[in-house]
Amino acid sequence: MPNKNDSLLYCSFCGKSQHEVKKLIAGPSVYICNECVDLCDDIIKEEIAEINSASESTTSDKKLPTPHEIRDNLDDYVIGQDTAKKVLSVAVYNHYKRLKHGAISDGVELSKSNILLIGPTGSGKTLLAETMARLLDVPFAMADATTLTEAGYVGEDVENIIQKLLQKCDYDAEKAQHGIIYIDEIDKITRKSENPSITRDVSGEGVQQALLKLIEGTVASIPPQGGRKHPNQEFIQVDTSKILFICGGAFSGLDSVIEQRVDTGTGIGFGATVRDKDSKATISETFQKVLPQDLIKYGLIPEFIGRLPVVATLTELDEHALVEILTAPKNAITKQYAALFGLENVELEFRENALIAMAQKAMGRKTGARGLRSIVEEVLLDTMYDLPSVKNVSKVVIDENVIAGKAKPLLIYSEEQERLASSDK
């Protein structure tokens, strides 16, 4: 231990004197030499390298499911939409294969294939994207295109989308770069006319322009832990070329644009094709014929469409599909409410005619699968309110009259249940 009366200065970490080292840096009551600084620097670099390699190996070593496996998993949670599932499975598989093996293979650069989902409200666009992210165990963030504006205008900056993704993975940029971002209501940012605008359209064409670089791939500078940007702060750098962007929208009116292009039924002359008035295709069938020029006419700019090369169309859900959605998926709505009632030791039964009535009600409201939960909630609200205060209820039965509002749910009490069971014997 150096003598306190000694005039020499010593490193507080290794104990070497100022004559034994090149530089001794003074702090409040402590000193550190250049050798200890170098040692600390090496230790920190090694730890950072270990963290990065662990993160990279976790991503690269993770088994990538095949398109068939992706499709099978989607089938467990999403009813119907077979074509969209197949398109999505292949596109997502190719995207993560590109990340796993590098964007360049044998000198050929592999471009990113972002996805555009076109389908009616409640057809399963958001659910497909969410289920895909859960299967692949990657961060997932969702944004509403209607809230976005160009930078510098009142509204949400497009880079806030990346911030949402960072928040989902505790601001780990490496994890975020392997995530999926779903932008909903993309059809609401179409420009007002087919011709380029000479005035600012900050929530339409302007947002499309702002999204271009982000979707194609750029290094976005994101403020840590949220907040607005200012010059004197450090930013988190996120490479968006590795992020998969899925855009979705109902595209109301797009069917008319497509029909104008493909319709030859109004032609005249010997070569014209005469089409029966009653042979009008459904909206879902028309959507399947969509081409880039239709989307341009609808209001998306050509550059934006070019960044979304994979297009999947979803069909409108019919009564049979809606009934299946209520009962078949692993997390079906009726199963969720049955589990909720089970926590009260009460069995919940939906009769077949009740399921059909709920499906018809959702179709009447034109809300698709999205409206089913609110219908079930409306039907069960009073029962869920009263049930914790009522004793000896063993079963609740819902039939079509309950859905129509003509009757209340049937409550079966435990004594009655026992009596019915004994009478069956």
Curated annotation (Swiss-Prot):
A Gene Ontology molecular function term of the record: zinc ion binding
UniProt: Zn(2+) binding residues: C11, C14, C33, C36
Binding site residues for ATP: P120, T121, G122, S123, G124, K125, T126, L127
InterPro entries cross-referenced by the UniProt entry: AAA+_ATPase, ATP-dep_Clp_protease_ClpX, ATPase_AAA_core, Clp_ATPase_C, Clp_protease_ATP-bd_su_ClpX, ClpX_bact, P-loop_NTPase, Znf_CppX_C4
Described function: ATP-dependent specificity component of the Clp protease. It directs the protease to specific substrates. Can perform chaperone functions in the absence of ClpP.
Top-level taxon: Bacteria
Protein name (record): ATP-dependent Clp protease ATP-binding subunit ClpX
Keyword rRNA-binding in annotation: no
Family of this protein: Belongs to the ClpX chaperone family.
Subunit description: Component of the ClpX-ClpP complex. Forms a hexameric ring that, in the presence of ATP, binds to fourteen ClpP subunits assembled into a disk-like structure with a central cavity, resembling the structure of eukaryotic proteasomes.
Gene Ontology terms: cellular component: HslUV protease complex
SUPFAM superfamilies from the UniProt entry: Glucocorticoid receptor-like (DNA-binding domain), P-loop containing nucleoside triphosphate hydrolases
ClpX-type ZB domain ranges (all copies): 1-52
NCBIfam families in UniProt: clpX (TIGR00382), PRK05342.1 (NF003745)
GO terms classed as biological process: cell division; proteolysis involved in protein catabolic process
Pfam family, one: AAA_2
Keywords: ATP-binding, Chaperone, Metal-binding, Nucleotide-binding, Zinc
